[in-house]
């Protein structure tokens, strides 16, 4: 009983909110960025204090009107006004409590981290040993190796863990004060948005109009009848299209033995918008056996081989032509070389004869009688041959 009396006294002291306060709270409710979470088993919306202050400083109440001062001039004035809203129970302060993981999961994560760090250290030791061997053989690359080691030392040894959002829950805060910062405040004030109000009003009017259909004029009833028939035909045509596309797919699939998958309007029954359900017009996929693919690959490889052989034959022809031109050039050089050799041979023979003649002149005194007789006999034989040659043409003339 005492607590209820205290609560009533607080309400009386605070009083009911004014129109201006309701307008500010409504603006803040629909324009300040909010998030939803669970609190005490209920789904609630919450906002952050600093974002609420920024939102109100950008509002129309932060601009001075003619003959009136601006309601919000500084961040402190916004904080004071939000304290008033908090006291009038538009929202209340909450405490963000992070959910702790069980001990088993933490132990497993630590063990995994240790195992990964041990493997990385082993890999690093192997890499360092290989680097030391290379540095001994190649002294010039020591500077590059030191730079790479410095870069590796700068990077952390363990791999970066994936950033995961930590789960938390909200609990009511003991100190109900509005503070500018990252403090969390849960909304209590939940007014009806104008859009939801308008949609509900239109729905109610439509239901009332449908119930009063017999009282409509004849022209309106005929028009509504044709509209309903058109809508029914449209829905029926979509259903028929869905069935027809399945039948077409089955026919093509059976004829081709399951190799061709053809879909007409593939997104017709998909969870997409009205326009996207008619895009694309069709899709086609080939899912044939591997043998056909191998045959195609073989045919392509044969074509490539033929093309390569033709290129090789062309290159060989070019090489033969180049070889012929080189042979003709070499033959010309060899002919000139042969003439030179013949000239040198004739010169050598003349030199030998001159030497022989000079030798005979020098060794004249040393010739024996037998050699003189042989020379005289040879001279006689030569004279006889000359006479025979002279006598032969005379006989021929006679």
Swiss-Prot record:
Q: What does this protein do?
A: Required for preprotein translocation.
Q: Where are its TM segments located?
A: 197-217, 235-255
| Ranges of Basic and acidic residues composition bias in the record | 101-155, 289-327, 337-355
- Annotated region (Disordered) at 101-167, 289-398
**Which compartments is it annotated to reside in?**
Endoplasmic reticulum membrane
**Membrane topology (Lumenal):** 218-234
Q: Name one GO cellular component term.
A: membrane
What is the protein's membrane topology class? Answer: Multi-pass membrane protein
Q: Does the keyword Membrane apply?
A: yes
- The organism encoding this protein is Gallus gallus (Chicken)
One of the GO BP terms on file: post-translational protein targeting to membrane, translocation
Q: Assembly and partners?
A: Part of a complex that contains SEC61, SEC62 and SEC63.
Query: What's the protein name?
Result: Translocation protein SEC62
**Acidic residues biased stretches:** 373-389
* Cytoplasmic topological domain: 1-196, 256-398
Q: Does the keyword Transmembrane apply?
A: yes
Family annotation (Pfam families): Sec62
Q: Which family does it belong to?
A: Belongs to the SEC62 family.
Which UniProt key words apply to this protein?
Endoplasmic reticulum, Membrane, Protein transport, Translocation, Transmembrane, Transmembrane helix, Transport
Main location per UniProt? endoplasmic reticulum
Q: Could you tell me which InterPro entries the record lists for this protein?
A: Sec62
Q: What is the lineage of its organism?
A: Eukaryota, Metazoa, Chordata, Craniata, Vertebrata
